Amino acid sequence: MSLVYLLIAILVIMAMILLTSKRRAMAKYAGYIALTAPVIASIYFLLQVPSVIKQHYLSVSIPWMTSLDINVDLRLDGLSLMFSLIISLIGIAVFFYATQYLSSRKDNLPRFYLYLTLFMFSMLGIVLADNTILMYVFWELTSVSSFLLISYWYNNGDSQFGAMQSFMITVFGGLALLVGFIMLYIMTGTNNITEILGQADHIKNHALFIPMIIMFLLGAFTKSAQFPFHIWLPRAMAAPTPVSAYLHSATMVKAGIFLLLRFTPLLGLSNMYIYIVTFVGLITMLFGSITALKQWDLKGILAYSTISQLGMIMAMVGIGGGYAQHQQDAIASIYVFVLFAALFHLMNHAIFKCALFMGVGILDHEAGSRDIRILSGMRQLFPKMNLVMMIAALSMAGVPFLNGFLSKEMFLDALTQTGQLSQFSLISMIIIVCMGVIASIFTFTYALYMVKEVFWTKYDSKVFTKKNIHEPWLFSLPSLILMVLVPVIFFVPNIFGKGIIVPALRGVSGGNHQIDPLVPHVSQWHGFNIPLLLTIIIILLGSVLAIKVDWKKVFTGKIRQISVSKGYEMVYRQFEKFTTKRFKRVMQDRLNQYIIMTLGIFMVIIGYGYIRIGLPKVHQLHVSEFGPLEVILAIVTVIIGLSLIFIRQRLTMVILNGVIGFVVTLFFIAMKAPDLALTQLVVETITTILFIVSFSRLPNVPRSKVNKKREIIKISVSLMMALIVVSLIFIAQQADGLASISNFYLRADKLTGGKNIVNAILGDFRALDTLFEGLVLIITGLGIYTLLNYQDRRGQDERE
């Protein structure tokens, strides 16, 4: 099955989900229909693993807008396969989990699963795209679907604000990324990613190389919640927990990391890129791990935990980016080791963090709270979730015998080896190691503290008063499966390493086969070395801080109020006030003012073109034959048009406007175009009658005083537009080098079966244009229908 067929199959499933919204009895099955999408995708990608290991990559290219080099280019190599497996396999767990989490009585299930499947489709599009513009389209689709999912409970103010904040930040990054893609096209002349990476040596010497890197970093940092763009992720926790488990821990937040990994052969040629990504990642890791201890909400803790872990992966991506400069050097193995560690931890993080979010969701769903000040002694009520969250949290902390320990050891090992790399000095290495170790200590602290406070403190029935708590097996099943994978990967890491991570490394290197001998062998025991010593320090200090310190009392008062998000909110409010004032000044609910603005902008554009290229000399002027009737009709039209400027009665103005239309009908008759005349007569009659009838529905607004300044502006704009139209007619007649297309229509109209040339143009030559004009009318009608029925739907929702 082709990659295109897979994406089409997902779209078909989305259509089936949409059909279930028509009947409430069918809506409860929407989740199981949606579940087929990740199942089909998982089976497909698992079947491709043997081929990708043998370096037999799938690629598809379908022409789209070939003149702009925008095609549907898809490619499945090792890197895209690894991310596709994460998206689809984690998707199975999340989709099934959502069927148990959401209620068919309270929630609009078809809408939720449609958005969730759209997000999965968009993420697969990002990782499979081999065309920059196609990648951008899917990139923004993830922002749109994320917005829809975060605002799913739209009656909740936090959901609305969180959705808008995440949308604004990620779309800003997406637009910056688009600018970067355009710069790449200017430098290379292609939008194909494989071809772009093949020109890396040429691009690095271009003047746009550094600006392009900055645009890429803005796109990656906003999407992957790097400091200071991290603020949208905690707010996004207002979404349903399945959304948090899927988008905001395992998939969407990894899109920025994927972008940098995909373009590592190009971006890694700049030392500036390596420094920025490394230190921004470490700052994010440190900031996230400390801020997580300020949170009382379990999802808030996991949100900042995700920010911290993403920073950790980002730092390794930055350090490993130097491989692009040193592929043939002796130190190339260090860069490969760091990139391997980044990919390994990316996979591990998706597993244990998704399990943690699911555990928190079950606690919230069954216990009715996520507040660690209320939850205590939950191991008695939730024994399965106690096991799941304890193992997943300890894996995140880097405790032995769990998969997180292996990737955390590799991370510490990578930091200690930075001193051997040309990009980093000894002082830089010391700073990097200190930042990584301190962040890891706080990571261990909040992981252990979270589990201790929720499960291992004394149960207090006075604080937690909810009764009849139960822990359904089907609800717990996805998190239990993910929990089992945590120790399994620890004991057999190289099965995943050779089958998934090594092919992904080839993708990161741009298909360089020389990377294979440099790939590290993952072992559980490395002997007594510096990373092990650092791990012992992290565990000891982290345990003391988690057990001996009551972090609920540490971050209180003014310390707790310090927040980067509040700075964003202040800027947002000021920006909103500023734009509201300007908006009210421009948007005054006067249609003629909007028309003046639109025409004014058009005139400025045309005028600028005239200034730049100048007006051509009029050396020929073709004027159609005309008689006395045409002259009389033209004079009548001008007189009526001028009179409209001075008349103030609405009814008279409408009638005179209709008269102009009837005069145009006479023009068509004089020019021997009866079909056009009949069409014009019918349309003009209907619109004039409707216009007059609509007066009965319009409010009796007092007549406004004549504003001479406004009238002068109207007349000036009208005269200028008339001059521009006439000048464009003259310019069109001077085009000697181009043959008129009119002759083609005259020769080919017989083939259409039409009775006249106008019908042939509308029905055949520009049929697609006519079709889309009809589509615009349909969309407008649907919008009006939605507005008219808004109150009815709102009342029905309130009754339900």
Swiss-Prot record:
Key word Membrane present: yes
GO cellular component: plasma membrane
Keywords: Antiport, Cell membrane, Ion transport, Membrane, Transmembrane, Transmembrane helix, Transport
Main location: membrane
Entry annotated with the keyword Ion transport: yes
InterPro entries: CPA3_Na-H_Antiporter_A, MrpA_C/MbhD, MrpA_C/MbhE, ND/Mrp_TM, Proton_antipo_N
Transmembrane regions: 1-21, 33-53, 78-98, 118-138, 167-187, 207-227, 241-261, 273-293, 300-320, 331-351, 387-407, 424-444, 472-492, 527-547, 595-615, 627-647, 651-671, 676-696, 712-732, 768-788
An annotated Gene Ontology molecular function: antiporter activity
One family name in Pfam for this protein: MbhD
Sections of the chain in a coiled coil: none
A single BP term in Gene Ontology: monoatomic ion transport
Membrane topology, from the record: Multi-pass membrane protein
Subcellular location: Cell membrane
PANTHER family: NA(+)/H(+) ANTIPORTER SUBUNIT, NA(+)_H(+) ANTIPORTER SUBUNIT A
Similarity comment: Belongs to the CPA3 antiporters (TC 2.A.63) subunit A family.
Oligomeric and partner information: May form a heterooligomeric complex that consists of seven subunits: mnhA2, mnhB2, mnhC2, mnhD2, mnhE2, mnhF2 and mnhG2.
Protein name, as recorded: Putative antiporter subunit mnhA2
Natural source organism: Staphylococcus aureus (strain MRSA252)
Lineage: Bacteria, Bacillati, Bacillota, Bacilli, Bacillales
Gene label: mnhA2
